[in-house]
C-alpha cells in the first residue's frame, strides 16, 4: 500500500505484471474446493513463468514456496484470493501496508470483495497477466488506542472497526467526538465505523447507508441503540473521530475487519482517521459498482 492518492487521482490504473515476478496465494482454509483450486492456480502461474508463494498462516499449497520472510512478502506483485470476503480481509491484513493489488475469486456466500466468479478464475487470471485488468484504490481506516495519553495499539482496516459489548450483559455508554467536539453520547450494543468499502458489510446489516467506494467519508452506525433518535452519521474522512467509554467499570471489545484485537476500558480513547494507505483492488476495466449491488444485494430489484 502507498500514501493515499484518492484525493488527487481516484481513477483506475492499468495493472501490468512483469514476467518472472512473484505472486501470492491466500485461500479459504476450511474449503476443499479452495485448496484444490489453489493447487491448479499455482500450476497455471508456474507454467507462465511466475514464482508462486503461499502467504503466511496457512498450509503451503503443493508446488509453491512458503512466504516466510519479509522480503518474500515485499517482492509480491499480486495476491490472488480464493474464498469469501473474510478470506479477502485476511489477505489485506497479511499484506501489512504493502501496495500489492489483490485479485479475489468468490468461493463463499456473498462475495462482495471477492467479486469475480471462481468459474471464470483462469480466464480472469490470464487477462490479468496480459495487462487487460485494472487496479482501483479503496480508502482504509486507521485507528489508535490511547491509554493515559500513550499509544498502546494501532490498526488499519479496509472494511470497518467496531466497538461492541460482546458477551458483556449491559449496554455500553459511548461518547463520540469529532475534532474534540462532542457529537453524541449513546447507550447501545456498540458502534461501527465503516469505510465506503465496508458500508455494505456489518454497517448495512445494522441499518447504515451504502456509500459509493469513491466517497470521501466514514459512516458511524450505532448497533441496537437504546434511543429513538440515534441514527447513522456520515463524516468527511479528513476529520478525526474519537470514542470513549463512559463509566469507570465499562468494558468493550475492539474488532478490526471482523477480528477481535483487544479489550477496551474506560481508561482508553479510540481515535479514528483515514489511513495513509490505500488498498488496491483488481477489477475488469468495465466493472460497474451498481451492477455489483444489484447482483449481490438485489439493490433496486423490482421483482
Curated annotation (Swiss-Prot):
Binding-site residues for NAD(+), renumbered to this chain? 85-86, 90, 159-160, 187, 189, 224, 259
Judging by the UniProt lineage, the source's domain of life is: Bacteria
Protein location: Cytoplasm
GO CC term, one of those recorded: cytoplasm
What species is this protein from?
A: Bdellovibrio bacteriovorus (strain ATCC 15356 / DSM 50701 / NCIMB 9529 / HD100)
Question: What biological processes does GO assign it?
Answer: NAD metabolic process; NADP biosynthetic process
Q: What cofactor(s) does the depicted protein rely on?
A: a divalent metal cation
Q: What is this protein called?
A: NAD kinase
Recorded GO molecular functions are:
ATP binding; metal ion binding; NAD binding; NAD+ kinase activity
Q: What is its EC number?
A: 2.7.1.23
Q: Which UniProt keywords apply?
A: ATP-binding, Cytoplasm, Kinase, NAD, NADP, Nucleotide-binding, Transferase
Supply the Pfam families for this chain. NAD_kinase (PF01513), NAD_kinase_C (PF20143)
Main function = Involved in the regulation of the intracellular balance of NAD and NADP, and is a key enzyme in the biosynthesis of NADP. Catalyzes specifically the phosphorylation on 2'-hydroxyl of the adenosine moiety of NAD to yield NADP.
- Kindly list any coiled-coil regions of this protein: none
PANTHER family cross-referenced by the UniProt entry: NAD KINASE (PTHR20275:SF0)
Query: According to its UniProt record, which reaction does this protein catalyse?
Result: NAD(+) + ATP = ADP + NADP(+) + H(+)
Record carries keyword Nuclease: no
Q: Which family does it belong to?
A: Belongs to the NAD kinase family.
Q: Please name the InterPro entries in this protein's record.
A: ATP-NAD_kinase_N (IPR017438), ATP-NAD_kinase_PpnK-typ_C (IPR017437), NAD/diacylglycerol_kinase_sf (IPR016064), NADK (IPR002504)
Asked if Nucleotidyltransferase is a keyword of the record, the answer is: no
What is annotated as the active site? Answer: 85 (proton acceptor)
Amino acid at each position: 500500500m502507498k500514501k493515499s492518492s484518492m484525493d488527487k487521482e481516484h481513477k483506475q490504473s492499468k495493472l501490468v505484471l512483469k514476467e518472472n515476478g512473484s505472486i501470492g496465494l491466500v485461500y479459504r482454509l476450511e474449503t476443499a474446493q479452495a485448496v484444490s483450486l489453489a493447487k491448479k492456480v499455482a500450476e497455471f502461474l508456474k507454467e507462465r513463468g511466475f514464482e508462486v508463494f503461499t502467504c503466511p498462516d496457512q498450509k503451503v499449497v503443493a508446488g509453491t514456496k512458503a512466504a516466510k520472510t519479509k522480503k518474500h512478502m515485499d517482492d509480491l506483485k499480486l495476491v490472488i484470493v480464493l474464498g469469501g470476503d473474510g478470506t479477502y480481509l485476511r489477505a489485506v491484513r497479511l499484506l501489512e501496508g504493502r501496495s500489492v493489488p489483490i485479485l479475489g475469486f468468490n468461493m463463499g456466500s456473498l462475495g462482495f470483495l471477492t467479486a469475480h466468479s471462481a468459474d471464470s478464475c483462469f480466464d480472469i487470471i490470464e487477462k490479468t497477466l496480459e495487462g487487460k485488468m485494472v487496479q482501483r484504490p479503496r480508502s482504509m481506516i486507521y485507528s489508535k488506542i490511547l491509554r493515559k495519553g500513550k499509544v498502546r495499539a494501532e490498526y488499519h482496516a479496509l472494511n470497518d472497526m467496531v466497538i461492541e459489548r460482546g458477551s458483556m450483559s449491559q449496554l455500553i455508554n459511548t461518547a463520540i467526538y469529532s475534532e474534540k467536539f462532542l457529537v453524541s453520547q449513546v447507550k447501545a450494543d456498540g458502534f461501527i465505523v465503516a469505510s465506503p468499502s465496508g458500508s455494505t458489510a456489518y454497517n448495512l446489516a445494522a441499518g447504515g447507508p451504502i456509500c459509493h467506494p469513491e466517497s470521501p467519508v466514514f459512516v458511524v452506525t450505532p448497533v441496537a441503540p437504546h434511543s429513538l433518535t440515534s441514527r447513522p452519521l456520515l463524516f468527511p474522512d479528513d476529520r478525526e473521530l474519537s470514542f470513549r467509554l463512559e463509566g469507570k467499570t465499562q468494558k468493550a471489545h475492539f474488532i478490526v475487519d471482523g477480528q477481535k484485537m483487544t479489550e477496551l476500558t474506560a481508561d482508553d480513547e479510540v481515535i479514528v482517521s483515514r489511513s495513509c494507505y490505500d488498498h488496491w483492488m483488481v477489477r475488469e476495466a468495465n466493472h460497474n459498482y451498481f451492477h455489483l449491488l444489484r447482483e449481490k444485494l438485489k439493490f433496486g430489484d423490482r421483482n
